[in-house]
């Protein structure tokens, strides 16, 4: 691994970011955590975003959990994706929190989802549960932008889900809605409620929701990348 100081300055361009990600390929999470002097959790149950934060640290990300992209200056979002030994994604991928109020006039073109997914650096990480967290290896990175077909599928799903939110049907949306994009509750506990619109236009309190990419989008994308 190149011996740049940690944490490095934010990358100046896409090429530098990709080079940094390539340099991490093949290392275990334990090796990277030890070098960064990070404590390795026993598992990810209580610290779901730990892998992403560790890689952000090495890559020089600046946004944290703000709504902008992780590498806002160069317009790139970082997404780690746990994969099986066959290179298939093991879970859905969080994109961003869904706005449940104040959505009049919002369009796909101006949406957070589209902004976050415009350019993504995907970093696959071994994710099978029998592999201890410290022994899981980082895979080869992939820079991706949605192609015409993927963008159309994302737009269609987003518009359908946003229509349901605006019409006060947020509580009837299930993870089965959407071909490649789903909406589901995102909260560590069921007491963290947020305001939304009810069926009759009245304010209601409900669990915060997040947009997630389904494996129907990420599996073919990884298969093309790794020629599976």
Curated annotation (Swiss-Prot):
Belongs to the MutH family. GO terms for biological process: DNA modification; mismatch repair. GO terms for molecular function: DNA binding; endonuclease activity. This is DNA mismatch repair protein MutH. It is found in: Cytoplasm. HAMAP family: MutH (MF_00759). Keywords: Cytoplasm, DNA damage, DNA repair, Endonuclease, Hydrolase, Nuclease. It holds the Pfam family MutH. Disulfide bonds: none annotated. It comes from the Bacteria. Sequence-specific endonuclease that cleaves unmethylated GATC sequences. It is involved in DNA mismatch repair. GO terms for cellular component: cytoplasm. InterPro entries: DNA_mismatch_repair_MutH (IPR004230), DNA_rep_MutH/RE_typeII_Sau3AI (IPR011337), DNA_rep_MutH/T2_RE_sf (IPR037057), Restrct_endonuc-II-like (IPR011335). Its main location: cytoplasm. The keyword Chaperone does not apply. Transmembrane segments: none annotated.
């Amino acid at each position: 691994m190149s011996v740049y100081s940690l944490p490095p300055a934010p990358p100046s361009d896409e090429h530098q970011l990709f080079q940094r990600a390539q340099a991490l390929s093949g290392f275990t999470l334990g090796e990277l955590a030890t070098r960064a002097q990070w404590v390795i959790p026993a598992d990810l149950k209580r610290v779901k975003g730990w892998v992403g934060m560790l890689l952000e640290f090495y890559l020089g990300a600046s946004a944290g959990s703000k709504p902008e992209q992780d590498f806002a200056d160069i317009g790139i979002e970082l997404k780690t994706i746990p994969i099986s030994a066959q290179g298939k994604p093991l879970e859905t991928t969080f994109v961003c929190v869904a706005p449940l109020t104040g959505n009049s006039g919002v369009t796909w073109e101006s949406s957070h989802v589209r902004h976050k997914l415009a350019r993504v650096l995907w970093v696959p990480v071994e994710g099978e549960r029998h592999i201890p967290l410290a022994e899981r290896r980082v895979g080869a990175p992939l820079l991706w932008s949605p192609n015409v077909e993927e963008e159309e599928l994302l737009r269609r799903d987003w518009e359908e889900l946003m229509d349901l939110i605006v019409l006060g049907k947020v509580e009837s949306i299930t993870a089965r809605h959407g071909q490649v994009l789903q909406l589901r509750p995102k909260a560590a506990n069921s007491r963290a409620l947020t305001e939304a619109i009810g069926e009759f236009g009245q304010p209601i309190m409900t669990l915060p929701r997040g947009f997630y990419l389904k494996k129907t989008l990420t599996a073919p994308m990884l298969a093309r990348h790794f020629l599976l």
